[in-house]
Swiss-Prot record:
Organism: Solanum lycopersicum
Catalytic activity: 4-aminobutanal + NAD(+) + H2O = 4-aminobutanoate + NADH + 2 H(+); 3-aminopropanal + NAD(+) + H2O = beta-alanine + NADH + 2 H(+); 4-(trimethylamino)butanal + NAD(+) + H2O = 4-(trimethylamino)butanoate + NADH + 2 H(+); 4-guanidinobutanal + NAD(+) + H2O = 4-guanidinobutanoate + NADH + 2 H(+)
Residues annotated as binding Na(+): 31, 99, 189
Biochemical pathway: Amine and polyamine biosynthesis; betaine biosynthesis via choline pathway; betaine from betaine aldehyde: step 1/1
Protein name: Aminoaldehyde dehydrogenase 1
Binding positions (NAD(+)): 159-161, 185-188, 238-242, 261, 394, 460
CDD domains per record: ALDH_F10_BADH
Coiled-coil segments: none
Keyword Metal-binding in record: yes
Amino acid sequence: MANRNVPIPRRQLYIGGEWREPVKKNRIPIINPATEEIIGDIPAATAEDVDIAVEAARKAIARDDWGSTTGAQRAKYLRAIAAKVLEKKSVLATLESLDSGKTLYESAADMDDVAGCFEYYAGLAEALDSRRMTPVNLNSDSYKSYVLREPLGVVGLITPWNYPLLMAIWKVAPALAAGCAAILKPSELASITCLELGEICREIGLPSGALNILTGLGPEAGGPLASHPHVDKISFTGSGPTGSKIMTAAAQLVKPVSLELGGKSPIVVFDDIDNLDIAAEWTLFGIFANTGQVCSATSRLIVQENIASAFMDRLLKWTKNIKISDPLEEDCKLGPVVSAGQYEKVLKFISNAKSEGATILCGGERPQHLKKGYYVQPTIITDVNTSMEIWKEEVFGPVLCVKTFKTEEQAIELANDTKYGLGAAVMSKDVKRCERFTKAFQTGIIWINCSQPTFNELPWGGKKRSGFGRDLGKWGLENFLNIKQVTEYTSAEPLAFYKSPSKN
């Protein structure tokens, strides 16, 4: 087991390149979801702290040491941060697991991905220098035009607790690469590693105010950030109701937002798959990785009727083989959910499904060997109909619901029977069928013969109530750039639109 005695640093808010105590001096306890014990606390920012952070960010943009940097100069900072993350990987991964309940294996993988994301956007920052000014050919000899790509300005980044540092970096890295000054507001349920990012930025000498980190409650810190008149954009990942509130606040100022709001993603399994075990493992990974706390989790299994019995038998055996334990234990593959509130929410979904007539095929309660912690067994629910809550609503926990189908048309109808549109997966060796499903799925992300692989180079985002805008890839960088048209009149001839006045 990893060392659970790693000390929890007692940080303040990271504003203007230094640690600052919150104006109201309040703090929020940190609860280890594996033990239910308080292991530390984080500062609780309020509107007053948001004002200070916004001012620090605006000063950073106005100063030459950040506001006038080239992409190549910003890339050096991003690469320095990446190197520090890898240097501190072991401690950061342990802190992440203690804070959020993620398995240590997943937390360590997240740190590799964090460093990789900074490296990726360092490359895009360098490439931005040659793209900053792009000439545009016009059908006119009298004008010369070009397009400028410029940083949007001060951006607010509000991020979730399920991948605390990684999903923060999906926004921080491109924002800094673009030359924006950012204010990061992570979830109060898991903020430790985001605060440690502040220490890393201090250590590598990131110009003050380029990145500011405010921990605290959503209404007290996130709300004032979203509605602040001097914040030029909000990028948010989280729940639908909170996303709606952010849109409402931003709308008053006609402020741009990008939103990633979760989903109820399907995985469709056809009878022509070559190997039941391969398909079963991908199905499990799609819903039980990160304890099911994944916005794109393929939480609805739609399996062809004539293989359903055999496939479910294999799926059940794989599920019962998952090691559930303290997330710091070696080979742990499923830890606790993040909080008491999330624990009660997941169990309520399971209870409601049973009350509505569904069958709890396996799981559905606390593992018997774990008396403390917010643990929920990996759960598979069958005999589900499309009117049930468990079919329609995002659980955000280790819960898979199952339906069968006979025809492709039925499978598509079931797959798209959701208000969300983030991800979808299809398992089949028929290439043409996979192409048909790629076109038919009403989602922003499609996986063929897999579920959940994620790459820095590819766009991440959805349709319908899963939100709009894209993280990652070149699209993630464009989120934080403003396009400015510049046109010059180059002819010596007068415009000749108005009648020239007499010279007398």
